[in-house]
């Protein structure tokens, strides 16, 4: 999913609500884990910067929650 589509489909309030639900129910870390796994196994291709950001975000979720 492209980030631009999120802004086109959902209001800022809806985006925040959805993000809070994902975080509160710990789905966010599962989604991050799955995305990173797909990248590492070659199922998905992303640039190095995006990969590093995903790993950093994953680590923050693991250690801060």
Curated annotation (Swiss-Prot):
Superkingdom, taxonomy of origin: Bacteria
Cross-referenced Pfam families: AbbA_antirepres
Record InterPro entries: Antirep_AbbA (IPR025446)
The protein's name: Uncharacterized protein YkzF
Organism: Bacillus subtilis (strain 168)
């Amino acid at each position: 999913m492209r980030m631009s589509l999120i802004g086109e489909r959902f209001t800022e309030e809806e985006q925040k609500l959805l993000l809070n639900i994902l975080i509160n129910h710990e789905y966010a870390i599962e989604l991050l884990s799955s995305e990173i796994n797909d990248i590492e196994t070659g199922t998905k291709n992303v640039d190095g910067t995006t990969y590093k950001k995903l790993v950093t975000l994953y680590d923050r979720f693991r250690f801060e929650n």
